[in-house]
From Swiss-Prot:
It comes from the Eukaryota. Its main location: cytoplasm. It is found in: Cytoplasm; Nucleus; Cytoplasm, Cytoskeleton, Microtubule organizing center, Spindle pole body. The gene is ppk9. It comes from Schizosaccharomyces pombe (strain 972 / ATCC 24843) (Fission yeast). Keywords: ATP-binding, Cytoplasm, Cytoskeleton, Nucleotide-binding, Nucleus. Residues 316-349 are annotated as: Disordered. The protein kinase domain is predicted to be catalytically inactive. This is Protein kinase domain-containing protein ppk9. One of its GO terms (cellular component) is mitotic spindle pole body. ATP binds at residues 29-37, 52. GO terms for molecular function: ATP binding; protein serine/threonine kinase activity. Residues 23-274 form the Protein kinase domain.
Length: 532
């Protein structure tokens, strides 16, 4: 069977059928301002996919393009049975299309249909979500947009985590600051606009998901969004009595307002409720800190499109930042697939467009063996964070929300008492001091001058985000430059924390496995002695 042909590069019509590239378009699965998702069937193999069609006009916006670029980059890096698979990326005059793995339904539809789920079903789904999140964190990826609609399912309740558009890479010693996601799912530190750890935010999202599955409504639901955000920041919610004590305990540990008191993913996987009814041999061992550098095979049409998603590919006719336009329909034909390696397939097989990723996922070298590889990982510094804001969206459970609103208006508003003040932490990060921040900064500058350092404050755009001050410095130790990032955090009206970490942002020094930490430790010791 030959590829359908037509004068249109965007779509083809043959006996009433509409094609985009090699895919026959079906029903619309979802619609948004920037993109729409349609069901697609391959013209030869009949393989079903979900076609995420992003309007090219929207990609003229730099932030939108970076978001799409980051999503493709992350999906190429992650290999896990519970993470959605990306098969192909191609471009037509009106859309840039991502061919994604097709699933039967999502968790939102399932919760709406059944009102709430039993604990056995909830546990089966929640385990897969946590395993996927743990794998993301192992590869230094924070999802940051966990919600019912982003958890896809098939008829066998196999979970696939999707929509990595708001995800970000995490660097050692660095925090994230972008406010993103949906208000009902947002963590307190995100709502307050403070710096946060992406792992802690994902744990909060897991807590919201678990509550929704067991109860059928949001834990912090209220009449107005402002009240919702206030309840989130204060941690005001109740757990119905029909939820088991073990599940309630796990929810409370995940929905701790203070991020440092929040349970970690590894601890979730050892919680009694999580491992209940799970055979001992099936319990996952402690993960290692290895990273995989193997990327999934993804085809690009036209071939120049691959350059935009992988800077290592070079072409004399295209450069990064220029979006290529197809000149004829042959660029969309499956007879010219291009892998990310940048080489054309001499004997292309149309079925490979669909099954190459299946082979990667379910072959003998599964994702477990990928985790054992430690040759490196994707450099996240190539993709800068994109600014965003928390948006006020409609409730994703409209029927439950309407019922809650009627109940609130028919009865006086009652709030549970605020939780008792958490006891002070016995452990803290960095060097804690009770001195005035201005005095600490003065001593810090004097110490840097005495050590012969060159230093500068952060730029105005990232200057002092309410509770943080940053200084970049360079100190010479044994004829070797040591670059430092010194941050002063305010953790209360009478306490501050100084954090000193190594920086590899300068081109003259790159952090590698062979780099000795001794100059850094020597400089930090001298600096601490000066300001003590």
């Amino acid at each position: 069977m030959q590829t359908p042909s037509s004068a249109s590069a965007e779509s083809e019509k043959d006996s009433g059928n509409t094609y985009v590239g090699p895919w026959l378009l079906g029903r619309t699965l979802g619609q948004g301002n920037l993109a729409k998702v349609k069901l697609g069937k391959h013209f030869q193999t009949n393989e079903k996919v979900a076609l995420k069609m992003v309007y090219n006009d929207e990609l003229e916006d730099k932030d939108t393009w970076k978001r799409l670029q980051r999503e493709v980059t992350i999906l190429r890096q992650l290999h896990h049975p519970n993470i959605i698979t990306l098969y192909q990326v191609f471009r037509v005059p009106k859309y840039t299309v991502l061919a994604l793995e097709y699933m039967d339904t999502d968790l939102h539809s399932m919760v709406v249909k059944h009102n709430r789920l039993d604990e056995c079903t909830t546990r089966k789904i929640f385990r897969q979500i946590v395993h996927a999140i743990d794998y993301c964190h192992l590869h230094r990826v924070a999802h940051r947009d966990l919600k019912l609609e982003n958890i896809l399912l098939n008829k066998d309740l196999v979970v696939k985590l999707t929509d990595f558009g708001l995800s970000n890479f995490m660097l050692d010693g660095s925090f994230l600051s972008t406010s993103c996601g949906t208000p009902h799912y947002a963590a307190p530190e995100v709502i307050q606009g403070r710096y946060y750890d992406g792992c802690d935010v994902d744990v909060w999202g897991c807590g919201i998901l678990l509550y929704l599955m067991l109860v059928g409504e949001f834990p912090f639901e209220d009449v107005t969004i402002s009240n919702v955000l206030s309840r989130v920041c204060k941690g005001i919610y109740t757990i119905p009595s029909f939820v088991s004590s073990s599940a309630s305990d796990l929810i409370r540990q995940m929905l701790m307002v203070l991020p440092t008191s929040r349970i970690k993913v590894a601890e979730i996987m050892q919680h009694p409720w999580f491992i209940a009814d799970l055979p001992t041999h099936s319990r996952l061992p402690s993960r290692t800190s290895s990273f995989s550098s193997k990327h999934r095979s993804v085809t690009f049409s036209p071939p120049d499109l691959a350059i935009l998603f992988d800077p290592s590919i070079t072409s004399p006719s295209s450069s990064v930042g220029q979006i290529p336009q197809p000149t004829d329909h042959s660029a969309l034909s499956p007879s010219k697939p291009m892998s990310i390696s940048g080489t054309e397939s001499p004997n292309p097989d149309p079925a490979s467009l669909c099954y190459s990723s299946y082979e990667d996922l379910y072959s003998a070298t599964s994702w477990h063996s990928d985790m054992a590889e430690s040759s490196g990982f994707l450099d996240p510094t190539d993709i800068p964070p994109i600014p965003s804001n928390v948006e006020t969206l409609r409730s994703s459970l409209p029927q439950r929300h309407a019922s809650f609103m009627n109940k609130v208006y028919n009865h006086p508003l009652s709030r549970p008492p605020a939780p008792n003040r958490l006891r002070s932490l016995r452990w803290h990060y960095g060097i804690q001091t009770a001195k005035n921040p201005i005095e600490v900064l003065r001593k810090l500058c004097e110490a840097l001058l005495e050590l012969g350092a060159r230093f500068r404050p952060c730029d105005e755009e990232s200057f002092l985000k309410e509770n943080k001050y940053k200084v970049f410095s360079c100190i010479t130790c044994h004829n070797s430059p040591v670059y430092l990032v010194i941050e002063l955090f305010s953790i209360g009206p009478s306490a501050s924390v100084i954090d000193i970490r190594f920086s590899s942002s300068d081109d003259s020094i790159k952090y590698t496995s062979s780099y000795s930490p001794m100059p850094f430790l020597e400089v930090v010791k001298q600096l601490i002695l000066k300001i003590a």
